Regions:
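Acidic, Mg2+-coordinating active-site environments of NTP-dependent enzymes
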Residues: 1-134, 159-160, 185
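Active-site beta-alpha connecting loops in nucleotide-dependent enzymes
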Residues: 120-123, 139-186
Length: 186
């Protein structure tokens, strides 16, 4: 995954393209620094991000605030979003969408409306309620980091009975079993 992202960064640098960078991800920040990327707009939960977000609550859906710090400080305004996504780990995806939307001239109000209206139906961060259970479905195209984030979120849920069912990570090939074991060992 890192190698492929590195190739993407190399392409962006070679073609003088803009990079939307998750400032909260040290690996991605290091890759950008190593390549001396010049055209960057950052987002994340760090104080250095151009678009900064903060989790307010996650019971069960992600509720967060965000601020566009790329505007002048006197014009910076904080907005709140109540999403239909499970897990604090989804804030990075939401902040990426916000950052790209702002770059292309979408208003904060339009962005918030879109984020609050989005209800996942693609096996990502879905809450399914049955007669006896609540199921969190987060199964589409899992990888070690996304699965670890989902498990951490699952651990934080304050419920009497819970069970996790982990699917395959077939794209990992021969190391799939090892990566599953690492998750179980945590």
């Amino acid at each position: 995954v890192k190698q492929t992202k590195g190739e993407l960064y190399d392409y962006l640098k070679a073609h003088d393209c803009l990079l939307f960078l998750n400032e909260s991800n040290a690996d991605l920040v290091d890759m950008a620094r190593q390549r001396e990327m010049n055209r960057i707009i950052t987002y994340g939960q760090s104080d250095d991000a151009n678009v900064r977000g903060e989790v307010i609550d996650c019971a069960p859906f992600l509720h967060f605030s965000w601020t566009d710090l790329s505007t002048t400080e006197s014009k910076a305004r904080t907005y709140e979003v109540e999403s239909h996504l499970i897990g604090a780990y989804n804030i990075d995806n939401m902040l990426a969408a916000i950052t790209i939307g702002l770059h292309f001239g979408v208003t904060p109000e339009q962005i918030n409306h879109a984020l609050e209206s989005y209800v996942p139906a693609n096996n990502r961060s879905q809450l399914e309620v049955t007669a006896k259970n609540k199921l969190i479905v987060d199964a589409y195209n899992a990888n070690p980091s996304s699965m670890a984030a989902a498990i951490e979120n699952f651990k934080l849920m304050n419920v009497e009975h819970k069970m996790a069912i982990l699917g395959d990570m077939r794209e990992l090939g021969e190391v799939s079993a090892l990566e599953h074991q690492k998750l179980v060992d945590k």
